[in-house]
């Protein structure tokens, strides 16, 4: 059956890991969509248990008969972006075991009248790694016909093996 995506929304902060998302789908076969959602929920609960035991996928029928939807080409570009974009931990610190050095997350995804916007929080304690990760996002976005705007840039805060401030803070903390 054919289906179209009319809108989607994730969390409201680009530097937070989303805990929910919604999507409006135009669907000709509601029972098939409900079966698919139930199957995905079962699989994802199995894969993410015990971290996400309450993971839920809900299908709620909407009686809206007319709405704007993404073209097939646009939907394919969005899907390609979501499947190919880096997400999560990209590198761990070589200086401090267990410390994330470079990471990013897709915090906000919205569909407007003429654009799909994805907002990422890109972080790294190494400036060059953060720049490289931002460049990866830029290249992928441009290859898919999109544009990139960088804002809210947090500077890298590199680990220093010799840090008088850290030594003082450790003394004060004790």
Which residues make up each language-model segment?
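Short secondary-structure junctions
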Residues: 2-5, 48-53, 99-101, 144-147, ...
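Glycine/acidic-rich beta-strand-loop module
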Residues: 8-12, 18, 104-108, 113
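C-terminal, non-catalytic macromolecule-binding modules
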Residues: 119-145
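A common structural junction motif
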Residues: 38-49, 139-146
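Short, hydrophobic beta-strand segments
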Residues: 19-26, 60-63, 116-123, 150-152
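Intrinsically disordered, low-complexity segments enriched in serine/proline and basic residues
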Residues: 3-12, 22, 26-32, 36, ...
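Solvent-exposed loop and beta-edge segments used for protein-protein assembly and interaction
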Residues: 17-19, 51, 98, 112-114
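An extended, acidic, His-containing surface patch that forms the Zn2+-binding/catalytic region
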Residues: 31, 58-104, 110-113, 127-132, ...
């Amino acid at each position: 059956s054919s289906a179209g995506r009319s809108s989607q929304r994730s969390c409201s902060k680009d530097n937070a890991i989303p805990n929910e998302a919604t999507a409006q789908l135009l669907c000709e076969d509601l029972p098939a969509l409900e079966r698919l959602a139930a199957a995905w929920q079962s699989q994802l609960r199995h894969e993410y248990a015990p971290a996400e035991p309450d993971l839920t996928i809900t299908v709620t029928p909407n009686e809206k008969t007319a709405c704007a939807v993404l073209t097939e080409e646009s939907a394919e570009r969005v899907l390609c972006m979501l499947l190919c974009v880096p997400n999560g931990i990209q590198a761990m610190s070589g200086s401090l075991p267990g410390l994330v050095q470079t990471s990013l997350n897709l915090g906000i995804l919205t569909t407007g009248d003429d654009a799909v916007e994805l907002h990422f929080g890109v972080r790294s304690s190494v400036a060059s790694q953060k720049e490289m990760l931002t460049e990866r996002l830029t290249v992928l976005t441009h290859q898919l016909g999109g544009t990139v705007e960088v804002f809210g840039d947090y500077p890298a805060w590199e680990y220093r093996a010799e840090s008088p401030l850290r030594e003082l803070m450790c003394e004060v903390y004790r």
